[in-house]
């Protein structure tokens, strides 16, 4: 709804401009920025400027904001644009009030329009600065795509037919097929390029035509296709539908996923956090503990990790550096570009559509906190009502998210829906430990058990399935085998069972009883 409102505002502004003086408003669609300096902090807002309008009386900057639901953001009234050394102050903003805390909606997404003093229409590049504070928002080097597309180094390109990020060009090497390629030959004639790339084992011929209408025709290894410059921080929506409904299921036969990546332009504070990159997941079938696979970063911030998996698995890709929560499938190779300066977070690979969609469209969160929870003041029935409403809110936000992206894959839709359901069930049982008087009736346990039985395989694709299963066993044990102890219950937690059985076996006892 916010995006529709912003578009209507844009149309109205254009009409007003044409009617008032007949002079044309210059528009930049999907401009590209050199630097989005708060990108690397996951607890800060993610800002994407998706449109700029240069009118005679003002410059309008259209911005998409992503931030956790119900958290607040604020833009100071000293916000300005900087072009050719001159400041152009903000006048007002549609969608939020300057210098006031603005709370994000439950979707965690907001579209706003900033109105600034008019920039010259011949402006080639400008900065967006929220005042001069050290931690204020800064988006630097904002440029029209028609100008930026002429600069090949550095740039990322997606195949228009498949929608995949297929190749990236940098001064010293190229990225293609999840590998690094050195320039064996490098020729340029005007806006046309021809390269011979090598990875040390084989060569690759690349021919690039001059840009036309924001695109370039490229021939890679003899295959010609149309390519578009990637201007957004995550990969844009794919151009075609995908009816694949589920992740790969190996039926729990061990295999390996390979993750290659580059933490480009990583700030010193992140280097200081550690010079290793890790991929972590929970071992669902053996130890019920976290498994971590690590790789040393080279001097540029590049890495390669082999991740042994028993099936398609939800993983956390390094809490110290990138904070990515995604799914890896056995037998696949992924390349992750995470650029701390430009803001790019994109996967390359033969089968990485879901991973890119999860980056572009994070699954809405369920807010499982409520007043009185940690003081054990809320009765079970009230807790159930609160969490049900929070789940329905997140489910509604997911539905709206899917409706906005007509071509989003069936796999994303199914995975996100089941992910929310698993999280909801886990939140209920976690909340059960904090209900008033520790009374959590059988009917609610049975309700969660019903959800648990409906969760599809492979179970490893949902991290919360681990906690959900343990908590469900604990609740069943409490109901069947616990002893009332005042307002609490005395019973044996499941994580004590293996150790207790080992001790009794060592004493030649056949059972615990």
Where on the chain are the PLM-derived regions?
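A non-transmembrane, solvent-exposed segment enriched in polar/low-complexity residues
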Residues: 143-151, 184-411
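Conserved functional micro-motifs across diverse proteins
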Residues: 20-150, 200
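Bacterial Sec-dependent N-terminal signal peptides
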Residues: 1-25
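N-terminal glycine/threonine-rich, aromatic-flanked beta-hairpin/loop signature
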Residues: 160-199
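A structural signal for short, hydrophobic beta-strand segments that form beta-sheets
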Residues: 40-42, 49, 87-93, 139, ...
């Amino acid at each position: 709804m916010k995006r529709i409102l912003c578009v209507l505002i844009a149309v109205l502004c254009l009409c007003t401009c044409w009617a008032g003086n007949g002079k044309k408003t210059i528009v930049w669609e999907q401009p590209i920025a050199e630097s989005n300096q708060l990108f690397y902090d996951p607890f800060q807002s993610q800002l994407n400027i998706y449109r700029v309008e240069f009118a005679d009386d003002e410059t309008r900057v259209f911005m998409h904001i992503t931030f956790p639901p119900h958290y607040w953001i604020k833009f100071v009234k000293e916000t300005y644009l900087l072009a050719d050394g001159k400041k152009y102050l903000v006048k007002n903003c549609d969608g939020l009030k300057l210098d006031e805390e603005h709370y994000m909606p439950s979707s965690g997404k907001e579209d706003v329009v900033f109105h600034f003093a008019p920039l010259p229409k011949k402006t080639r590049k400008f900065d967006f600065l929220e005042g001069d504070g050290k931690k204020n928002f800064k988006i630097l080097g904002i440029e029209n795509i028609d100008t930026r597309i002429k600069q090949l180094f550095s740039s990322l390109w997606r195949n228009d037919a498949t929608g995949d990020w297929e190749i990236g060009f940098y001064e010293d090497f190229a990225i293609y097929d999840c590998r690094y390629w050195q320039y064996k030959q490098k020729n340029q004639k005007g806006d046309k390029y021809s390269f011979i790339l090598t990875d040390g084992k084989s060569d690759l011929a690349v021919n690039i035509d001059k840009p036309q209408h924001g695109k370039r025709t490229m021939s890679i290894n003899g295959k010609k296709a149309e390519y578009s410059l990637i201007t957004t921080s995550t990969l844009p929506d794919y151009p075609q539908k995908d009816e694949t409904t589920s992740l790969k299921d190996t039926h729990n036969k061990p295999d390996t996923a390979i993750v290659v990546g580059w933490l480009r332009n990583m700030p010193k504070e992140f280097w200081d956090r550690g010079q290793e990159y890790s991929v972590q997941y929970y071992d669902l079938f053996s130890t019920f503990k976290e498994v971590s696979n690590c790789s040393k970063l080279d001097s540029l911030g590049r890495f390669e990790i082999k991740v042994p998996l028993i099936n398609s698995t939800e993983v956390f890709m390094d809490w110290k550096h990138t904070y990515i929560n995604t799914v890896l499938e056995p037998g696949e190779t992924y390349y992750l570009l995470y650029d701390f300066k430009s803001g790019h977070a994109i996967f390359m690979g033969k089968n990485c559509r879901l991973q890119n969609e999860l980056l572009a469209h994070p699954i809405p969160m369920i807010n499982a906190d409520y007043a009185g929870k940690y003081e054990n003041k809320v009765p079970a029935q009230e807790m159930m009502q609160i969490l049900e409403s929070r789940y329905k809110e997140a489910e509604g936000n997911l539905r709206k998210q899917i409706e906005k992206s007509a071509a989003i894959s069936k796999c994303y839709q199914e995975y996100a829906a089941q992910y929310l359901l698993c999280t909801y069930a886990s939140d209920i049982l976690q909340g059960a430990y904090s209900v008033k008087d520790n009374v959590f009736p059988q009917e609610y346990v049975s309700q969660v058990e019903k959800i648990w039985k409906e969760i599809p395989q492979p179970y490893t694709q949902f991290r919360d399935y681990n906690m959900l299963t343990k908590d469900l066993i604990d609740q069943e044990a409490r109901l069947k085998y616990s002893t009332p102890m005042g307002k609490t219950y005395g019973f044996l937690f499941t994580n004590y069972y293996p150790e207790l059985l080992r001790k009794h076996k060592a004493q030649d006892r056949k059972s615990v009883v």
